[in-house]
Amino acid sequence: MSTLKNTFFITPPDTPTQAGPENIFYDFNDGARVLLPEGKWHVRLLDADSENILFCCDVDKGWVTSSKKYFVRFRIQVFRQGEETPLLDETLKLKDRPVLISFPTGTLGDLLGWFPYAERFQSLHKCRLECTMSQDIIDLLAPQYPQIQFSTPDKPRTVAPYATYRVGLYFGGDTNNQPVDFRKVGFHRSAGYILGVDPREAPVRLDLSAPRVIQEPYVCIATQSTCQAKYWNNGTGWSEVIAHLKSLGYRVMCIDRDAHYGQGFVWNHIPWGAEDFTGKLPLQERVNLLRHASFFIGLPSGLSWLAWATRIPVVLISGFSLPNSEFYTPWRVFNSHGCYGCWDDTSLNFDHHDFLWCPRHKNTDRQFECTRLITGAQVNGVINKLHRSLTEQGVEATLKKGVSNE
């Protein structure tokens, strides 16, 4: 296996891994790839499902590769020029084949959103699947998915994969690495389209067996994110929410990794009144705490995805992304009375290097109004509905008596 080309994806092997006749090599590790020796060849790349010819050419020697890198049931045909019967005729067949899905090593939310599609892919094709990702997420997921091999990108175990797929966020209108722009379908569902499986969302499986430790009703919150546009930028919002939660009888625990986060002159701090449960802890410890929370309140960030996977209600506050950009929750908080949805606007490209990115209103009094216009009263209204629902189910009354809801 070749080394990392960048910090995101594993590059394909230098030579295709499958040997055909006449010293022809091919594989599906960067779309369909064929490496031809000296000769007079005619090559066709087809979509085996539609039987459309995607590309054909005459070539004397060298490479023929598809422009499409996502899952297509490719058919590769290699003819000697002038002959009607192909010397090589190979249709993609993944059953029992070594297959690699390369994920970026990046953020928690991306991986938790994407990974269920990898499991769906393995179940569909019955391939020998390896997935590469960061070690902390491997530690969280691997015990729940014994049929899949996990590794970090610098130490892949599959040395000669038959096929490789790279799941990530592709900007700039890229439709070679994804069949549809992720901003049109929601970033997590894009993985389903890249892998050619059912794009309906599903939470990852987690170990939810930890016993309840805190007997009082409590709510977990996460207020930090990776850029200012993702924050809840209402100045008094969190303090209003925390005060309201306490009036309802909840302890409020902030579980961000960082109590303080920002760049340059803009920094965000743990909200006053929340109990400080911040810190760089193993993800399983976060799961153990979330599992027994009455509910979670957060942003379009990784901890919201983690909370969703623990099967507790999630109040998700966002204006930076559209309501269908993340998993469905009936407790989503969104305000349509100002600017919103820049993340999902295909005419814009997110600038990962600009912490204060606000493409339509930066340096104006409308900057970050997508969440600034979401008031504490609006969020508290959603909390009231959720609290009433839990009370009607008898959940909160049981907890107030100090009895576990297990």
From Swiss-Prot:
Resulting phenotype, W305A: Severe loss of catalytic activity
Keyword presence, Cell inner membrane: no
InterPro entries tied to this protein: Aah/TibC-like, Glyco_trans_9, TibC/BAHTCr-like_N
Effect recorded for C342S: Loss of catalytic activity. Loss of iron binding. Does not form homododecamer
Enzyme class: transferase
Binding site for Fe(3+): C339, C342, C358, C370
Cofactor(s) recorded in Swiss-Prot or TrEMBL: Fe(3+)
EC number: 2.4.99.-
Cofactor note (record): Binds 1 Fe(3+) cation per subunit.
Chemical reaction(s) catalysed: ADP-D-glycero-beta-D-manno-heptose + L-seryl-[protein] = O-(D-glycero-alpha-D-manno-heptosyl)-L-seryl-[protein] + ADP + H(+)
Gene3D superfamilies given in the database record: Glycogen Phosphorylase B
Binding site for ADP-D-glycero-beta-D-manno-heptose: T107, L108, G109, Q224, T226, K230, R257, L281, G302, E326
Documented effect of changing R286A: Severe loss of catalytic activity
Top-rank taxon: Bacteria
Active site residues of this protein: D110
Phenotype for V266D: Loss of catalytic activity. Does not form homododecamer but forms homodimer
Keywords carried by this UniProt record: Glycosyltransferase, Iron, Metal-binding, Transferase
Subunit structure: Homododecamer composed of 6 homodimers forming a ring.
Leftover remarks: Able to functionally replace the autotransporter adhesin heptosyltransferase (AAH) of the AIDA system in fully restoring activity to the AIDA-I adhesin depending on the modification of AIDA-I with heptose residues.
Job description of the protein: Glycosylates adhesin TibA. Specifically adds anomer D-glycero-beta-D-manno-heptose. Cannot use ADP-L-glycero-beta-D-manno-heptose as a sugar donor.
Family classification: Belongs to the glycosyltransferase 9 family.
Protein name, per record: Autotransporter heptosyltransferase TibC
Species for this entry: Escherichia coli O78:H11 (strain H10407 / ETEC)
